[in-house]
């Protein structure tokens, strides 16, 4: 099952790097580690003409489930606001990732045709939101 998740994540990553580099940053996995992917995440670049919510709404309307990323911004969570803890820095990068990163699933029951559908809908969205 993990091999299929990895295949799906790598397929999306390769396509994002080759075709969507103008719009998104993607994680590059360290070759010295084995990763277990549940989602493929990508972060909007600062100069995008659209935001995460716009893209998420488009993908969701096409039956592609998306999720945001928490990205280490626990102090911003309502249930943790009154907890005492040490916060180092202003969490600027964590907040940027939280606000501009989107995740799509790479479940083992999804095949390459499903990944191609995600890419088709990305193309559709990007062609109208350059």
Question: Predicted regions span which residues?
Answer:
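PLP-dependent aminotransferase class I/II
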Residues: 1-130
């Amino acid at each position: 099952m993990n091999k299929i998740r990895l295949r799906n994540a790598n397929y999306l990553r390769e396509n994002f790097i080759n075709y969507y580099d103008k719009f998104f940053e993607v994680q590059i996995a360290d070759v010295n580690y084995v990763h277990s992917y549940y989602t493929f995440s990508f972060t909007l670049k600062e100069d995008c003409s659209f935001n995460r919510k716009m893209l998420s709404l488009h993908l969701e309307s096409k039956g592609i489930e998306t999720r945001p990323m928490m990205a280490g911004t626990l102090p911003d969570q309502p249930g943790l606001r009154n907890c005492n803890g040490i916060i180092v820095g202003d969490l600027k990068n964590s907040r940027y990732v939280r606000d501009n990163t989107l995740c799509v699933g790479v479940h083992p029951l999804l095949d390459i045709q499903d990944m191609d559908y995600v890419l088709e809908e990305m193309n559709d969205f990007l062609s109208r939101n350059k």
